[in-house]
Amino acid sequence: LVKGGGAAHAREKYVDASADRFVVVADPSKAAEVLDVSVPVAVLPDARPVVAERVTELGGEPTLRDAERKDGPVVTDDGSLVLDCEFGAIEAPGDLAADLSAIPGVVEHGLFVDLADAVYVGTSDGVQVTER
């Protein structure tokens, strides 16, 4: 699962950590066998160049997320910047999550590996439920 389109993935993980259950609700367009979407990575502003270099070494292509309604980059509620990182098909999301977490200056990334207790996908035929 990749989250962070709204740049709140760090906060979402804090909420998950304090909740008894983490349930994801999505539409069918979000379902995929292999993750191949950009991974948001929240970084400390001063660490951005180093984090970008390390992401590149991991095979990613980091891009600083620009704000849509103001000049400059997106700044999260906690003051982090967001790098949108393209990795292509992510065959081992757990390994990539661990590698990203190990980079100094990374506040949090949008890979939610083995965190959801249940996933509800709404379809035209009803709801598909996957429990962990």
Residues covered by each model-derived region:
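Conserved phosphate- and dinucleotide-binding cores of soluble alpha/beta proteins
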Residues: L1-R132
